Amino acid sequence: MRLFIFLLVAVLLLFQYDFWFGKNGYLDYKRTAQQIAQHKQENEKLSQRNQVVAAEIKDLKQGVEAIEERARFQHDMVKPDEIFYHIVKEQK
């Protein structure tokens, strides 16, 4: 009878070890859940950035103001008979 109880305890310990430390065990599950949460957070940031870029693309395709703004500030372009003043702040 003692041998039987000893074998049952040994099997129970073996299963517990496999549950906690084995492949797809509890620790592996927690690590994977943490990685999933991190990836979801990264995906949310990327989704927000994509929405901003999509809105900018839509504005460039449909509106003249965005194209005009880019031409003025990125390429220093002006309309005919227009004077553009660029004020630079002093650096201390």
Swiss-Prot record:
Keywords, comma-separated and alphabetical: Cell cycle, Cell division, Cell inner membrane, Cell membrane, Coiled coil, Membrane, Transmembrane, Transmembrane helix
- The name of this protein is Cell division protein FtsB
User: What quaternary structure, including any partners, is listed in this protein's UniProt entry?
Assistant: Part of a complex composed of FtsB, FtsL and FtsQ.
**Matching HAMAP family:** FtsB
Taxonomic source organism: Pasteurella multocida (strain Pm70)
The GO cellular component terms are: cell division site; cell septum; plasma membrane
Record GO biological process: FtsZ-dependent cytokinesis
How does the entry describe its membrane topology? Single-pass type II membrane protein
Family per similarity comment: Belongs to the FtsB family.
